[in-house]
């Protein structure tokens, strides 16, 4: 019976830790950029796009494809930084694990 109670306590603690981490990720802001800062995106800890900043000199109707590539590169840069931040928050524990709702 004691083992069951210990397991329940451990599961409750893990759930509380997950809830706390979810809240931290929601307010986390990570910036990624490309083109030497010509395009910058900001993601939250859940990799949801929060903002995009495009320098006016990049906007050229004849170079739309380049702008699209810069946006994708900036997003990918920020997404990689979110992964790094998450791994750091987890302290290496389970950084390689695919935890639903966290990765």
Predicted features by range, described:
Residues 1-31, 81-103:
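Long amphipathic alpha-helical segments used for membrane anchoring, targeting, substrate engagement
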Residues 6, 63-70:
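Conserved acidic
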Residues 14, 47, 71:
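Residue-level signature of catalytic and energy-coupling elements of molecular machines
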Residues 25, 29, 34-36, 56-58:
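Short, well-ordered turn and helix-capping elements at secondary-structure junctions
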Residues 33-53:
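N-terminal intrinsically disordered, cationic/polar leader segments
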Residues 38-40, 59-61, 79:
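Short beta-strands and strand-coil junctions in structured, solvent-facing domains, enriched
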Residues 52-64:
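A short interface-forming secondary-structure element
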Residues 70, 74-82:
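Stable alpha-helical structural segments in soluble proteins, enriched in small hydrophobic residues
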């Amino acid at each position: 019976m004691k083992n069951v109670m210990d397991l329940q306590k451990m599961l409750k603690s893990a759930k509380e830790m997950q809830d706390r981490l979810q809240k931290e990720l929601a307010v986390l802001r990570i910036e990624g950029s490309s083109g030497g800062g010509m395009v910058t995106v900001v993601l939250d800890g859940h990799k949801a796009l929060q903002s995009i900043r495009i320098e006016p000199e990049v906007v050229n109707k004849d170079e739309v494809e380049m702008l699209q590539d810069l946006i994708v590169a900036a997003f990918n840069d920020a997404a990689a930084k979110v992964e790094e931040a998450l791994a750091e928050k987890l302290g290496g524990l389970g950084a390689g694990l695919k935890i639903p709702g966290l990765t």
